[in-house]
Amino acid sequence: MKENMLFSGESKNIEYKVTVPDKSEKYMKTVVAFANGKGGKIVFGVDDKTLEIVGMNTENIYKTMDAITNAISDACEPAIRPDVALQTVKDKTVIVVEILPGAQRPYYIKSHGMIDGTYVRVSGTTRHVEGYMLKELILE
């Protein structure tokens, strides 16, 4: 994805996080929402309010990337396999997590179950699905 598109603001398929949260659940809702929709990217190292590229601490960045991959693989049902990559922008390194649209919808957070753990993306927000939307995802 081109840099100007990647950093043009949150949207239906882009989410920004300043850092990787200690609790993966803070971004897992977005992961399943992207898988339930047309896919998307989570960019760690960008302030979601100002769009300032703050970058990531590169000291243990590969461990961080592995932790993201493992968290997504372990927390989601059916399993989601993210593409996690580094990108350098204005001499700062960000982590870009790409989630492809899923073929086995609905995707949900395993620990919450299908009814409580299924999310979709609406514009630049992640929303819990209502009953009828869950049925639509199942029937797709």
Where are these regions (language model features)?
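Conserved N-terminal catalytic/coupling substructures associated with nucleotide/phosphate chemistry
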Residues: 1-140
